[in-house]
Amino acid sequence: MSPNGSDRSPRRPMRRKLLQALTAGLVLATATGCTYEDFPRLGMPTPTTEEAPRILSLWQGSWAAALATGVLVWGLILWSVFFHRRSRTKVEVPPQTRYNLPIEALYTMVPLVIVSVLFYFTARDESDLMSLNKKPDLTVNVVGFQWSWCFNHIEDVPGSTGDAKTSKELAGIPDRFIEDFPANAGGVYDCGTPGTENPQTGNPGPTLWLPKGKTVRFVLTSRDVIHSFWVVPFLMKQDVIPGHTNAFEVTPNKEGTFLGKCAELCGVDHSRMLFNVKVVSPERYEQHLQDLAKKGQTGYVPAGIAQTSHEKNRETNNL
C-alpha cells in the first residue's frame, strides 16, 4: 500500500487484456477475407455506375464522423474509468461540478454541428442522385410482383409493333414519364418465374440487360405489394409501391453480371425474389433486344396498379 493510502491494482493484467483485444481485432480483420483494397469501402461492393462513387463517398464520410465521435466519447469514458476509478484520499465523495455553462454549450453545439454537416451533404447528394434527365438514353419499366420481376424495355425494336405512349399495359404509369418515351416504341419484355434459375447464367431469377455508358431510367411499378428494387453494386435502391410510381437513373460504366434482389419484406418467398443485371456493350444490348423480339416477347407486360388519385394530385409536372 502506498503512503497516501492508495491501493492500486497492478497494470500488467490490463495491458495483457489490451494486447488480447488488439490481437482479436487483427484476427477478425484478416478472417473476413477482404483485401486491403476492400477496407476503404467499409463493406460496400465495388461501384459499377457513374453515380455510385458519390454514394460511397457519403457512406465513408458518415463512418468517419461516427468513428471520430466514438473515439472522443470512448476516450473520455476510458480516461474517467481508469484514472478516477478510486479516490486517492480518504474522502469518499469528491467535489461535485454542476452548472458548467461552457461544457454544456459544447455538448449542445458539437452534436448540432455534426448533424448539420451530415444533413447538408445528404440533402445535396440526394437531390443530384434523384434528379431526372429530360431525355434519358433508354427507359426500363421494372415491374415487381410476388415473387419475381418483369422488365419492359421501352425501345423501338425491329419486329415489335405498337406505341408505348398509347399502350394500355403501360397506362398505369404517370403521364410525366410517358411523355419521355420514344416515339413508336413497340418494345420488348422479359419476365422471371418465382424460384427458378436463369438458363443463361445459372443464377436465380431473370436477367436485365443494360448497355454500358448509357443513362438508364428505371420506372418502378408494382402489381401487388411493396417491393424494393436493389442492384447491389449500383449502391442504389428504390421502393416499388403499388399505386405510386418511383423512378431513378444510373449510367453503368463496368461490364459484368451483378446481383439484384428485393430489399423489402414482401411475403413468404421474399428471399427468392432475385434477379441479375448484365451490363454489356451497346451493340450486344441491341442484339439482345432483337433476340427477345425473335422469341415473340414483343410489346409490354402490364405495369401494375395504376397511380391512385391521391398520388396524381400530389404529383407535379416537373421532373
Swiss-Prot record:
UniProt signal peptide: 1-33
Catalytic function, reaction form: 4 Fe(II)-[cytochrome c] + O2 + 8 H(+)(in) = 4 Fe(III)-[cytochrome c] + 2 H2O + 4 H(+)(out)
GO molecular function terms attached to this record: copper ion binding; cytochrome-c oxidase activity
PANTHER family: CYTOCHROME C OXIDASE SUBUNIT 2, CYTOCHROME C OXIDASE, SUBUNIT II
Gene of this entry: ctaC
TM annotation in the entry: 63-83, 101-121
Described purpose of this protein according to its UniProt entry: Subunits I and II form the functional core of the enzyme complex. Electrons originating in cytochrome c are transferred via heme a and Cu(A) to the binuclear center formed by heme a3 and Cu(B).
Domain of life: Bacteria
GO CC field: plasma membrane
Family: Belongs to the cytochrome c oxidase subunit 2 family.
Subcellular location: Cell membrane
Main location: membrane
Note describing how the cofactor binds: Binds a copper A center.
Positions bound to Cu cation: H227, C262, C266, H270
NCBIfam families: CoxB
Enzyme Commission (EC) number: 7.1.1.9
Cofactor(s) the record lists: Cu cation; heme
A GO BP annotation: ATP synthesis coupled electron transport
CDD domains cross-referenced by the UniProt entry: CuRO_HCO_II_like_5
InterPro entries reported in the protein's UniProt record: CcO_II, CcO_II-like_C, Copper_CuA, Cupredoxin, Cyt_c_oxidase_su2, Cyt_c_oxidase_su2_TM_sf
Keyword vocabulary terms for this entry: Cell membrane, Copper, Electron transport, Membrane, Metal-binding, Respiratory chain, Signal, Translocase, Transmembrane, Transmembrane helix, Transport
One Pfam short name: COX2
Membrane topology category: Multi-pass membrane protein
Name of the protein: Probable cytochrome c oxidase subunit 2
